[in-house]
Amino acid sequence: MAKSSMKAREVKRAKLVAKFAEKRLALKAIINNPTTSDDDRWDAVLKLQGLPRDSSAARQRNRCSQTGRPHGYLRKFGLSRIKLREATMRGEVPGLRKASW
């Protein structure tokens, strides 16, 4: 079970990503535009570097909704492999059952 502070940190990161998404997108558009002057591009790079580090989507980590486990996460269910298996064995996941061939 992950510490509650780790779960809270991920929630905070998600809020920051949502808050700065438009600003980051605009700055990246300026940087990647080939017609932008070097001075404008450099200003955009500095502004992008000035944004909070946790506002980057690459710093987010998918976590199990029940335990907060960061590894073995299955996007379709929002659970780790362990909790998904437990729920499946209890019959709580419709349409999912143990493989047999």
From Swiss-Prot:
Biological process terms from the Gene Ontology for this record are: translation
Recite the UniProt keywords alphabetically.
Ribonucleoprotein, Ribosomal protein, RNA-binding, rRNA-binding
**Pfam family for this entry, one:** Ribosomal_S14
Q: GO: which molecular function terms?
A: rRNA binding; structural constituent of ribosome
Q: Per its UniProt record, what Gene3D superfamilies does this chain match?
A: 1.10.287.1480
GO CC term, one of those recorded = small ribosomal subunit
Its domain of life reads Bacteria
Q: Which family does it belong to?
A: Belongs to the universal ribosomal protein uS14 family.
Its subunit composition reads:
Part of the 30S ribosomal subunit. Contacts proteins S3 and S10.
**Family matches, as NCBIfam families:** PRK08881.1
What exactly does this protein do? Binds 16S rRNA, required for the assembly of 30S particles and may also be responsible for determining the conformation of the 16S rRNA at the A site.
Q: Know the name of this protein? A: Small ribosomal subunit protein uS14
- Organism equals Shewanella woodyi (strain ATCC 51908 / MS32)
